Amino acid sequence: MNSSSKNAVVYWGTGRRKTSVARVRLIPGTGKITINGRPGDHYLNFNPAYLSAVKAPLHTLGLGEAYDVLVNVYGGGLTGQSDAIKQGAARALCELSVDNRKPLKTEGHLSRDPRAKERRKYGLKKARKAPQFSKR
């Protein structure tokens, strides 16, 4: 790492979805995405839905190639992780400028998705699945 990259301005954001937590850093650069030390497309298995979710906040503001995205993410699966990264990137972009908040909010990138796995209840097989009923 050279001295110019050490002095570069870094914007932080944290995102969550299901059981996933992502810590996102935005650094002025060329639009490269690195997730847990691996290239973003490799980490997300080249899945276009996951890749577009990660890039969505940057494309909303027209900054797709302006910042490098460095991510540490843990917990959950790829769906939860990609949406957590999306929210973390959006929050980091709000740190960049206050004017970025309104377009990101209207697109829904700043809102936390509250859906999570429902707990299993006693007397049932799963969260809502009852055991087979026998009349006789």
UniProtKB/Swiss-Prot annotation:
Biased composition (Basic residues): 117-136
Transcription regulation recorded as keyword: no
Start-end of Basic and acidic residues biased regions: 103-116
Gene Ontology CC annotations of this record: cytosolic small ribosomal subunit
Segments forming a coiled coil: none
Record keywords, A-Z: Ribonucleoprotein, Ribosomal protein
UniProt key word Ribosomal protein: yes
Superkingdom of the organism of origin: Bacteria
Matches recorded under InterPro entries: Ribosomal_Su5_D2-typ_SF, Ribosomal_uS9, Ribosomal_uS9_bac/plastid, Ribosomal_uS9_CS, Ribsml_uS5_D2-typ_fold_subgr
GO BP: translation
One Gene Ontology term of the molecular function aspect: structural constituent of ribosome
Location of region: Disordered: 103-136
Family designation: Belongs to the universal ribosomal protein uS9 family.
HAMAP family attached to this UniProt entry: Ribosomal_uS9_B (MF_00532_B)
Official protein name in the record: Small ribosomal subunit protein uS9
Gene: rpsI
